[in-house]
A protein has these predicted regions:
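Membrane-anchoring alpha-helices and their flanking helix-loop junctions
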Residues: 1-57, 77-133
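Membrane-interface loop-to-helix entry segments
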Residues: 57-73
Length: 133
């Protein structure tokens, strides 16, 4: 991707943002793979619940309620850093807003499905950032 940026914009060469952005993208993708593995059969691509779905609260989910969305934010923070312009920042802010709306909808569905168990889990863990206790 960096080669593409340099090819399309020959005067553009900022190694620190490129390196930092790629590191963030790799971390985000790796985080995403770990999260999907931890979810296993509980992975649902939409903000819905399934009849056999179980509440996952271990692994990365013991720290934050939505590590999958956190992985997306880390990945696209890397994209924004690589782009090194206002468009990348605006896109990232829009993504944050959209994900928060989606998370709220998903959490309402999880409260309906898991009730008090999910509400207790919400009290113990942060939405996207671990709670410090």
């Amino acid at each position: 991707m960096g080669a593409l940026v340099i090819t399309l914009y020959p005067g553009f060469y900022m190694p620190i943002p490129l390196i930092a952005g790629f590191i963030l993208m790799i971390v985000g993708m790796g985080f995403n793979l770990v999260v999907r593995k931890e979810l296993g059969k509980n992975w649902v691509p939409l903000s819905k619940t399934t009849p056999n779905q179980e509440l996952v609260t271990d692994g990365l989910y013991s720290r934050v309620r939505h590590p999958f969305y956190l992985s997306i934010l880390i990945l696209f923070t890397g994209v924004a850093v690589i782009s090194w312009n206002w468009y990348g920042l605006i896109f990232l802010m829009a993504l944050v807003g959209g994900l928060i709306i989606r998370i709220k909808k998903e959490e309402n569905n999880l409260i309906i499905k898991f009730g008090d168990e999910y509400q207790e889990y919400m009290e113990k863990t942060g939405m996207l950032i671990p709670k410090i206790t």
